């Protein structure tokens, strides 16, 4: 995606452009910074800088749906089993229906206090759990079907940056493998 919110699909081998589409918010200033994108077998899901998730067809870049979010995202959505999971700057994670874009559930994590790194980590998703990192240093394991809490942990106390500024953000994608989860915080 370029600075004008134009997203291009290019051939991997030749660089030939297959399609280009605008994924910003129509009628708004184009200076917002987006979060990222992910894909399944048929669609591309973009968290743009305008507090929206946009679903496009991979084949031609046609917009399938566009969902307004209650706050901006600064991470790529995670897609698995017909759900799109997106973390928001205000400490929420949402599960969206991948086919239609409606919100299935919302979980509000601990936002925390102090300074923040202006970005977020994407959630890690398995068949059984959504591992959601939050700016407060909280890591929550949620049930993918309804967002119910399986467990939570607070990974780090706030780190003093100097003066009164403190930060405790989780900035790396949690890794899930062989029945364990590993996450890094600031």
Which positions does each model-derived feature cover?
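Short loop/turn segments that connect beta-strands within beta-propeller blades
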Residues: 11-15, 57-61, 97-101, 143-147
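Beta-propeller domains
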Residues: 2-16, 135-140, 163, 171-186
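Extracytoplasmic beta-rich repeat domains
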Residues: 17-38, 63-80, 103-127, 152-178
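Structural signature of WD-repeat beta-propellers
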Residues: 2-3, 32, 48-49, 88-89, ...
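Mobile, glycine-rich extracellular loop/lid and propeptide segments
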Residues: 9-12, 38, 45, 85, ...
